[in-house]
């Protein structure tokens, strides 16, 4: 547990730092610096992009963690990573072409209500591709037990950049109409940085050759694609559905409540960045005793931490909502129910 404890602690610090900066953005800067409609637009676009990226990654971000340590030959490892690099490009191109062909129908979908989304709807697919590539490169680094920098990029980088962007908007150095485009550039820059880092950790010789276990990889990736979409859908589909049934300004009301409850998930997220690659390694090397010990320790530790955080949030929920503009309040029950779900996620430990 030495490597797990060390990197989990560093990831926990960076993740909570990221959540703190995110809380500043979500609870204070967004509500006060953006209109409720534009805040809803930002929440909707990012949530919609999150629904697409599991299809674009096609499960390969998890397949890297699961199978990389199983390959013994450099040629197999390089070919495997090469496939992982081109998969988001292929799937993103297919989805992008389909979106282009259906673009008029997409615009018509937003014509009756929420017309504010129309000029920015095309950004959903590129943002999805960027998220997919980020996860692939991050998994790339994690299999070499280099999770700390990637976690900084995942949790802190874009949130700090968004804080700066909101400051520029407040001082009218950028126009509100261009805010979304600058936001997309932040996600592009994040992918470039993590991509350079991953290639510095290990730079494969690009080659595409049929892997001896390609059927197993494809079946696992397909399963992860489905599981990954369900996991993301549980977090973001509701925000997209709210846009469908209600005006877009209702999206951030729900989004704020979800964000408050999501703080409870930070411990398990931090531990999984390093524990998941170790789990795959133990499975591949048939070290079942060590795997069982890892599961038990992670479950007990995460339950204690997450339970404490849940109680802390519930006991101070009135004070938290007091700092938010009145029109964004009203998600008390959402915080409680989603918070309980996050505690259960932590209880499952690394096995979840």
Residue ranges of each PLM-predicted region?
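Membrane-water interface segments that mark the loop-to-transmembrane alpha-helix transition
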Residues: 6-18, 45, 54-104, 119-122, ...
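Interfacial segments at transmembrane-helix termini and the short loops linking adjacent helices
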Residues: 105-124, 248, 313-345, 349
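Membrane-interface junctions at transmembrane-helix termini in multi-pass inner-membrane proteins
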Residues: 5, 130-154, 339-352
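Hydrophobic alpha-helical transmembrane segments
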Residues: 122, 152-200, 220, 258
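Transmembrane helix-bundle signature of multi-pass secondary active exporters and lipid flippases
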Residues: 46-54, 231, 254-273, 305-309, ...
């Amino acid at each position: 547990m030495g490597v797990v404890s060390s990197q989990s602690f560093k990831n926990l610090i960076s993740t909570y730092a990221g959540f703190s900066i995110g809380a500043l953005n979500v609870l204070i800067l967004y509500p006060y610096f953006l209109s409720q409609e534009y805040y809803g637009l930002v929440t909707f676009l990012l949530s919609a992009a999150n629904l697409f990226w599991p299809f674009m990654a096609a499960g390969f971000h998890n397949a890297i963690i699961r199978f990389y340590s199983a390959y013994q030959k450099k040629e197999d490892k390089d070919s495997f990573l090469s496939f992982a690099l081109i998969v988001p490009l292929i799937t993103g191109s297919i989805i992008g072409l389909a979106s282009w062909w259906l673009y008029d129908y997409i615009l018509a979908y937003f014509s009756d209500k929420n017309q504010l989304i129309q000029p920015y709807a095309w950004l959903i697919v590129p943002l999805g591709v960027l998220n997919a590539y980020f996860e692939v490169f991050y998994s790339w680094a994690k299999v070499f037990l280099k999770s700390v920098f990637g976690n900084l990029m995942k949790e802190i980088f874009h949130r700090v950049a968004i804080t700066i962007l909101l400051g520029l908007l407040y001082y009218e150095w950028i126009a509100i109409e261009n805010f979304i485009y600058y936001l997309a550039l932040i996600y592009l820059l994040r992918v470039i940085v993590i991509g350079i880092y991953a290639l510095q950790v290990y730079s494969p010789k690009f080659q595409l050759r049929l892997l001896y276990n390609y059927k197993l990889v494809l079946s696992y990736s397909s399963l992860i694609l489905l599981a990954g979409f369900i996991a993301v859908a549980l977090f973001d589909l509701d925000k997209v559905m709210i846009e469908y049934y209600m005006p877009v300004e209702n999206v951030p009301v729900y989004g704020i409540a979800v964000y408050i409850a999501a703080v409870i998930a930070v411990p398990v997220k931090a531990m999984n960045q390093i524990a998941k690659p170790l789990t795959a390694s133990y499975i591949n090397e048939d070290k079942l005793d060590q795997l069982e010990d890892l599961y038990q320790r992670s479950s007990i530790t995460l339950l204690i931490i997450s339970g404490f955080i849940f109680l802390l949030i519930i006991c101070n929920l009135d004070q938290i909502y007091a700092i938010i503009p009145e029109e964004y309040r009203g998600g008390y029950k959402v915080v409680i129910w989603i918070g309980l779900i996050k505690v259960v996620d932590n209880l499952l430990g690394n096995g979840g």
